[in-house]
Amino acid sequence: MPRPASHLAPMPSDHPDFRSKSARLRCQPPRTNNCGTFKQPPSVAATSRPKPGNPFLQPPTKGTPPPKKKKKNHTEGCHTHEANPEPNTKHTETESPKPQTSTQHHTPITIPSSLLSQNTQREKRGLPLLTSRPSTIPANTYQPQSPHIHSHTPLQRPISTALLHQNLHIRARNIRHTGRLHGSPTKGAQTAQQAQPHPPKQLATL
C-alpha cells in the first residue's frame, strides 16, 4: 500500500512523534490504580530499576560476588569418553592386544624340576646353566622345517667307487696335460699314458 505524501513534509517540533521518548513519557499523565496511588508506566518501571529476581542485572555487592552459572560438564552422560582424557591418545578400552607373531607357534616351555635343581647347584659353582633346548636356538623363534633352508650348500650324495676312480683319473690327466704344454713330459709319464688307455666315461647310477 503506498504511503501518503504527508510524511515528506517537515514535521513540526510540537508534533507528538517528533519528541523523544522521555519527553513523551513526561507529558503523559500519571497513572493511578484503584486505590488512587501513583503508578509508573510499564516502560519506565522496566528500565529504571532491575527486577529483584535476576542476579545479572543487580550491581555487584562488596561482600559476595554474584553467583555464576555452573557450566555443564561435557563428559556427563557420555560413556565413551573419560573424565580427563590425555591429549593425543586413543581409547584402548575396546582394543584387544595383538598377539606376538614369534610366540604364536609355541607352547609355554616347561623346565623339569631336575634341571632346576642342577641349575641351582651349577649357579653356586659359577658354571653355565643347563637348558632343555640347545643354546644356539633362541627359545621364542619359530623355524619352519622346510627343505629349502640350506639350498646354498651342495647336496651330499653317495658316490660310487667307479665314479670316484674316474674323477681321480680325469684329475691326473689334466695335470699331465698342463705339464705337456709347459714342457716336455718325462718318459715314465709317456709310457704310463700309452700303457693305460682311457676308459670310457660311465655315469654312476644313484
From Swiss-Prot:
Biased composition (Polar residues): 97-120, 132-148
Sequence ranges of Basic and acidic residues compositional bias: 74-96
Top-rank taxon, per record: Eukaryota
Region (Disordered): 1-153, 179-206
Family: Belongs to the UPF0328 family.
Name of the protein: UPF0328 protein ECU01_0050/ECU01_1560
Organism per entry: Encephalitozoon cuniculi (strain GB-M1) (Microsporidian parasite)
Organism taxonomic ancestry: Eukaryota, Fungi, Fungi incertae sedis, Microsporidia, Unikaryonidae
